[in-house]
From Swiss-Prot:
Disulfides per UniProt: none
GO cellular component, one term: cytoplasm
Molecular functions per Gene Ontology: aldo-keto reductase (NADPH) activity
InterPro entries assigned: Aldo-Keto_reductase, NADP_OxRdtase_dom, NADP_OxRdtase_dom_sf
Pfam families named among the record's database cross-references: Aldo_ket_red
Keyword Cell membrane set for record: no
Family named by the database record: Belongs to the aldo/keto reductase family.
Name of protein: Probable aldo-keto reductase 3
Residues engaged in binding substrate: H138
EC number annotated for this UniProt entry: 1.1.1.-
Assigned keywords, A-Z: NADP, Oxidoreductase
Binding site for NADP(+): S217, P218, L219, G220, R221, G222, F223, F224, S225, S226, G227
Protein source organism: Oryza sativa subsp. indica (Rice)
Amino acid sequence: MAAAAATAPAAAVVRRMKLGSQGMEVSAQGLGCMGMSAVYGERKPEADMVALVRHAVAAGVTFLDTSDVYGPHTNEVLVGKAGAAAAATEEEVQVQVATKFGITPAWEVRGDPAYVRAACEGSLRRLGVGCIDLYYQHRIDSTVPVEITMGELKKLVEEGKIKYIGLSEASASTIRRAHVVHPITAVQIEWSLWSRDVEEDIVPTCRELGIGIVAYSPLGRGFFSSGAKLVDELPDDDFRKSLPRFQPENLEKNAAIFEKVNAMAARKGCTSSQLALAWVHHQGSDVCPIPGTTKIHNFDQNVGALSVKLTPDEMSELESYASADVVQGDRYHGTFLNTWKNSETPPLSSWRSGN
């Protein structure tokens, strides 16, 4: 029996949470905005996306996630407009915008000080703000000591251009080195039922250091919403069509994971996406998932995940469906940008002034 028609209570309350230990407070679920402008097919109509963001903020989801490489640049412009419109409508609501730097429009990774500063200035301009709430290094430049990149970010904090610093796809050792220069507020990682390798070192390191965890792609890039049939519905220019897990030889085997999750969702009276998202929420009060969508209906369904309760036995059962030996295919293809597995940087002693 399919669970598509069943939903958890639509009026789920979106609680607030402390993200990290530096004072940042956000909604316990965020909104990933990438797909509104880039990567997942063609750019969506601006008016529709502004309406979606306003709907999200009115519902209590006030933590918006973007990056300068989405578009490139157009997603930041959209989020800036939409966030401002939402804030104007919901006068007592504080909208937090997180953006990122480090991936150039040519899909190269850079973390040198001059680039960091120029990227920040560009994001401030496109977002239409005087200060960025949370500024992530999107990917780690393996040619620049992370201390050098962090040093420039620290200056930007001191100048009032950013409030909090984050890292994305960073290893535990890189996180530790960066945190010495300036406290890291949040680390963004891919964390979902079928992407759990971060649990060994990265998650414990974040918790040891008081760093919040932002889980991107918590629905497996849409896989846990509709399973293998998702790929048949994607346009040719959708990024997911190139990913190993979505290739026919892997997708056929991964389809069984979705079917088991979907069956459990039917038993619990929720959708498969709500169940998978609830699993991420149950990882701890320091974890903020940021599912993305371009449809208000899907957004409402995602918020409903906050009302889904899971027992320890149910958590274990879900995890058994998507254990490491069951999931077929890597997260990215081998030629893609740096992930946390290749985010180590040279020692600080190797850097010379003027590099």
